[in-house]
């Protein structure tokens, strides 16, 4: 029989007491408040403390740069090129005028100087285009003590180095272990809870339990990211029979929204852990999952969504029409499919604060596990959510126009740039139609002016 020495027994006892105290604190201050949807204000106090530390760190670096007669690196938030919103015709007129050529109205034919316009536009696009920079992390104006966000290493003092090292220990040893425990708790409760609810007969009681199980588990998962969320205009929250559309930055957008509302999810059937979660969730709630072979069938997808929204007793569908993650500086083209089925649309704008951690998932650079590790080793996830008034398709609108109107409303409320480009350009080459569009504009300018002159 194996006997413990007195010293070994003491260590085991202390370890057991420590784990008991840790679990008790976890239960009392995090899990129980998450279950009931209340907060003790600890996270907001934590956020205010971090802001003061970031401000102090920035002042220290500015002082170090000043002593060396240098300036700190500052990102160009509006781009590195000053661009005036002028048309192709106006710019070519200006080029011909400055080159002492004849005016465009007098000479509709091709001029050799016209190529300077296209050369300049090409060089501007290579240096600073408005599309590809939306697929990389947003640059910060100040350092947040995460090494991956600092461009001013040479101005770090000894005090800042010690503070950064202390931050690494806190994030990777204390916060990471705590967050993993919370995430495991939330996911386990979601799978077990929804599976058990799924065995109940359909009715109000099952719907009541399903709603509160989902909310409880998502709120625990929100705590696992130390997410500090501010919800605005809750009176506009999506209702049954509608579609909730939002800008898309990260997979955690789902958790952010689902911790404050009850939604039917739409997505492709997965395997592994995600597949286990999906199968458990659909037992308790009418989510809309598609097989891989069905996703490409637009008519089948539209029919399934239409059938869902026509039943006013079913939950609002949560959809991200961009179809890919954007870095939360802009909103890109909304796919029209969600706007063709004639349901009431409830727009939602989500804006993250990158000071505490970059929520953007660059899926072409990081896998899901790496991304979640980055999230759980950040300081926090801070964001604001705005519920906009419901919108319906007008009689004279087609689906594309309706989608653009909803997109503009989301961009305006969230302080994001409204772009017409397709987010699919993250992985695909630019279509020839985009290239041909510039050729058509130039041809129309030349040929059109020539035809007008011939008629007169």
UniProtKB/Swiss-Prot annotation:
Its EC number is 2.3.1.15. Residues 1-37 form the signal peptide. The HXXXXD motif is essential for acyltransferase activity and may constitute the binding site for the phosphate moiety of the glycerol-3-phosphate. Its main location: endoplasmic reticulum. GO terms for cellular component: endoplasmic reticulum membrane. Pfam families: Acyltransferase. One of its GO terms (biological process) is CDP-diacylglycerol biosynthetic process. It comes from the Eukaryota. The chain crosses the membrane at residues 156-176, 180-200. The keyword Transmembrane helix applies. InterPro entries: LPCAT1-like, Plipid/glycerol_acylTrfase. CDD domains: LPLAT_LPCAT1-like. Keywords: Acyltransferase, Endoplasmic reticulum, Glycoprotein, Lipid biosynthesis, Lipid metabolism, Membrane, Phospholipid biosynthesis, Phospholipid metabolism, Signal, Transferase, Transmembrane, Transmembrane helix. Converts glycerol-3-phosphate to 1-acyl-sn-glycerol-3-phosphate (lysophosphatidic acid or LPA) by incorporating an acyl moiety at the sn-1 position of the glycerol backbone. Active against both saturated and unsaturated long-chain fatty acyl-CoAs. Protects cells against lipotoxicity. Belongs to the 1-acyl-sn-glycerol-3-phosphate acyltransferase family. It is a multi-pass membrane protein. A motif (HXXXXD motif) lies at residues 248-253. It catalyses: sn-glycerol 3-phosphate + an acyl-CoA = a 1-acyl-sn-glycero-3-phosphate + CoA; dodecanoyl-CoA + sn-glycerol 3-phosphate = 1-dodecanoyl-sn-glycerol 3-phosphate + CoA; sn-glycerol 3-phosphate + hexadecanoyl-CoA = 1-hexadecanoyl-sn-glycero-3-phosphate + CoA; sn-glycerol 3-phosphate + octadecanoyl-CoA = 1-octadecanoyl-sn-glycero-3-phosphate + CoA. Pathway: Phospholipid metabolism; CDP-diacylglycerol biosynthesis; CDP-diacylglycerol from sn-glycerol 3-phosphate: step 1/3. It comes from Bos taurus (Bovine). It is found in: Endoplasmic reticulum membrane. This is Glycerol-3-phosphate acyltransferase 4. It is an enzyme of class 2 (transferase). GO terms for molecular function: glycerol-3-phosphate O-acyltransferase activity. Glycans are attached at residues 247, 327-328, 362.
């Amino acid at each position: 029989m194996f006997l413990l020495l007195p010293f070994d027994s003491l260590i085991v006892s202390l370890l057991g007491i420590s784990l008991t105290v840790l679990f008790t604190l976890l239960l009392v201050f995090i899990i129980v408040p998450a279950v009931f949807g209340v907060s003790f204000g600890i996270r907001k106090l934590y956020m205010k403390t971090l802001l003061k530390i970031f401000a102090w760190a920035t002042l220290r670096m500015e002082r170090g740069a000043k002593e060396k007669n240098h300036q700190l690196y500052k990102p160009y938030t509006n781009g590195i090129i000053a661009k005036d919103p002028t048309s192709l015709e106006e710019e070519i007129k200006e080029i011909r005028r400055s080159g002492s050529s004849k005016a465009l109205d007098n000479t509709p034919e091709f001029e050799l100087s016209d190529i300077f316009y296209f050369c300049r536009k090409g060089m501007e696009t290579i240096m600073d285009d408005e599309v590809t920079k939306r697929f990389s992390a947003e640059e910060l104006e100040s350092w947040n003590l995460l090494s991956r966000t600092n461009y001013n290493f040479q101005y770090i003092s000894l005090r800042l180095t010690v503070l950064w090292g202390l931050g690494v220990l806190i994030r990777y040893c204390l916060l990471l272990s705590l967050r993993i425990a919370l995430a495991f708790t939330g996911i386990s409760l979601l799978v077990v809870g929804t599976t058990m609810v799924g065995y109940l007969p359909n009715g109000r009681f099952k719907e009541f339990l399903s709603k509160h199980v989902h909310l409880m588990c998502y709120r625990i998962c929100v705590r696992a990211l130390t997410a500090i969320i501010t919800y605005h205009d809750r009176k506009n929250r999506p209702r049954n029979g509608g579609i909730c559309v939002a800008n898309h930055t990260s997979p955690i957008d789902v958790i952010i929204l689902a911790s404050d509302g009850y939604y039917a999810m739409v997505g492709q059937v997965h395997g592994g852990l995600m597949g286990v979660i999906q199968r458990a969730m659909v037992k308790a709630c009418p989510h809309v999952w598609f097989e891989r072979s069905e996703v490409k069938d637009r008519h089948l997808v539209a029919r399934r969504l239409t059938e869902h929204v026509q039943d006013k007793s079913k939950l609002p569908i949560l959809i991200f029409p961009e179809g890919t993650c954007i870095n939360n500086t802009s909103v890109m083209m909304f796919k029209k499919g969600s706007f063709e089925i004639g349901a009431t649309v409830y727009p939602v704008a989500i804006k993250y604060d990158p000071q505490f951690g970059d929520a953007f998932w660059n899926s072409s650079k990081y896998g899901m596990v790496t991304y979640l590790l980055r999230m759980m080793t950040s300081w926090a996830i801070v964001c604001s959510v705005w519920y906009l008034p419901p919108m319906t398709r007008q009689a004279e609108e087609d689906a594309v126009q309706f989608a653009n109107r909803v997109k503009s409303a989301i961009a305006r409320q969230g302080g994001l740039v409204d772009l017409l480009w397709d987010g699919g350009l993250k992985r695909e080459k630019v279509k020839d139609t985009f290239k041909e569009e510039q050729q058509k504009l130039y041809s129309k300018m030349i040929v059109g002016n020539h035809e007008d002159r011939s008629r007169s």
